[in-house]
């Protein structure tokens, strides 16, 4: 596997830390050891997160190509767009963000707090759009790029989740390399890795990275899209492309994509009672915050699997905490009583 041939612009502090979730493990019976790899604190750029890791492999193209404006898209409380705004500010570039109405959630402050607030503070041109949630290339994003060109700028396109970019999966191939180095220091290997999966490139890159040591099917994606067939197809496509790019040496097949669809309901961006319980439980036992859109659902999935005995006794499970905590502010009504 060859990742070193790709240019990388450092945006993170270095390897994100792996920390034990001792109290949560004990609360769930102590038969499974839970750990978290903290992508939620991987960078000093506006709270960082998984997209910051991905952007390290996209940014060199933007710099080398003389682009002056980063153009991206997400929901109103998109973590992606906040991280793109931060990177644009860091590089001295302009930033245009399309924020679509991906979540059927009504709150008076939803479009004024959290991620979107930070993007505005960092100087991004934020454009609200009424289109609902879906996976793939969006007309509103294409129009934003045309607008930049018409005004004399040179737009660099960054798709939702970085996932449609050919290099979107590379950052999480590197994540797997980091884990292997950290496992040497820890003195053991993780039996399973749990990760939230929506637009696909985080899961796909991780799958390819762990396929290098035979653990592709030990990467358990927790669907939060509520459009699992689209997510599954996207993960497979991105993983197959990424495997070729890094010269993995074997083909990625549909059997390599493990996607648990039990926890995404009722729909994208809306938490269920299990999501909220998982958010509170992890916060109160570990002081680790997760959000209602992504990490709360993957945390719910991991907790539920431990409770159900789905991990063999003695398993060491790594939870990939991808970030997303700023979105909590947009869901304050749900937590008005804690």
UniProtKB/Swiss-Prot annotation:
A Pfam family matched in the record: PALP
Disulfide bonds: none
GO BP terms, alphabetized: 1-aminocyclopropane-1-carboxylate metabolic process; amine catabolic process
Quaternary structure note: Homotrimer.
Listed cofactors: pyridoxal 5'-phosphate
EC class of the enzyme, as a word: hydrolase
Gene3D superfamilies, A to Z: 3.40.50.1100
Positions of the catalytic residues: 78 (nucleophile)
Sites of N6-(pyridoxal phosphate)lysine modification: 51
Top-rank taxon: Bacteria
Reactions it catalyzes: 1-aminocyclopropane-1-carboxylate + H2O = 2-oxobutanoate + NH4(+)
EC number(s) stated in the UniProt entry for this protein: 3.5.99.7
InterPro entries linked to this entry: ACCD_DCysDesulf, ACP_carboxylate_deaminase, ACP_carboxylate_deaminase_bac, TrpB-like_PALP, TrpB-like_PALP_sf
Family, as annotated: Belongs to the ACC deaminase/D-cysteine desulfhydrase family.
The entry's keywords: Hydrolase, Pyridoxal phosphate
Descriptive protein name: 1-aminocyclopropane-1-carboxylate deaminase
GO molecular function: 1-aminocyclopropane-1-carboxylate deaminase activity; D-cysteine desulfhydrase activity; pyridoxal phosphate binding
Gene name in the database record: acdS
Record function comment: Catalyzes a cyclopropane ring-opening reaction, the irreversible conversion of 1-aminocyclopropane-1-carboxylate (ACC) to ammonia and alpha-ketobutyrate. Allows growth on ACC as a nitrogen source.
């Amino acid at each position: 596997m060859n990742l070193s041939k790709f240019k990388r612009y450092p945006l993170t502090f270095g390897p994100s830390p792996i920390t034990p979730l001792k109290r949560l493990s004990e609360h769930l019976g102590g038969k499974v050891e839970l750990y978290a790899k903290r992508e939620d604190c991987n960078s000093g750029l506006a709270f960082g997160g998984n997209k910051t890791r991905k952007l390290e492999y996209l940014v060199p193209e933007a710099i080398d190509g003389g682009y002056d404006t980063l153009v991206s898209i997400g929901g109103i409380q998109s973590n992606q767009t906040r991280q793109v705004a931060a990177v644009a500010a860091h590089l001295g570039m302009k930033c245009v963000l399309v924020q679509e109405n991906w979540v059927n959630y009504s709150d008076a402050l939803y479009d004024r707090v959290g991620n979107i607030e930070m993007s505005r503070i960092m100087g991004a041109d934020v454009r609200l759009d009424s289109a609902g949630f879906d996976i793939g290339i969006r007309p509103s994003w294409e129009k934003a790029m045309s607008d930049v060109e018409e005004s004399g700028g040179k737009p660099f396109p960054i798709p939702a989740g970085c996932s449609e970019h050919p290099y979107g999966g590379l950052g999480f191939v590197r994540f797997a390399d980091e884990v292997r180095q950290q496992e040497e220091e820890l003195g053991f290997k993780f039996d399973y890795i749990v990760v939230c999966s929506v637009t696909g490139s985080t899961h796909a890159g991780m799958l390819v990275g762990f396929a290098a040591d035979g653990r592709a099917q030990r990467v358990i994606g927790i669907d939060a899209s509520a459009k699992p067939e689209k997510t599954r197809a996207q993960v497979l496509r991105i993983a197959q492309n990424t495997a070729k790019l890094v010269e993995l040496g074997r083909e990625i097949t549909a059997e390599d994509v493990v996607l648990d669809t039990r926890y995404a309901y009722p729909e994208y961006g809306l938490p269920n009672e299990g999501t909220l319980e998982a958010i509170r439980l992890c916060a109160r036992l570990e002081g680790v915050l997760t959000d209602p859109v992504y990490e709360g659902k993957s945390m719910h999935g991991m907790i539920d699997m431990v409770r159900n005995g789905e991990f063999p006794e003695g398993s060491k499970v790594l939870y990939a905490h991808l970030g997303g905590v700023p979105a909590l502010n947009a869901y304050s009504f749900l937590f008005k009583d804690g």
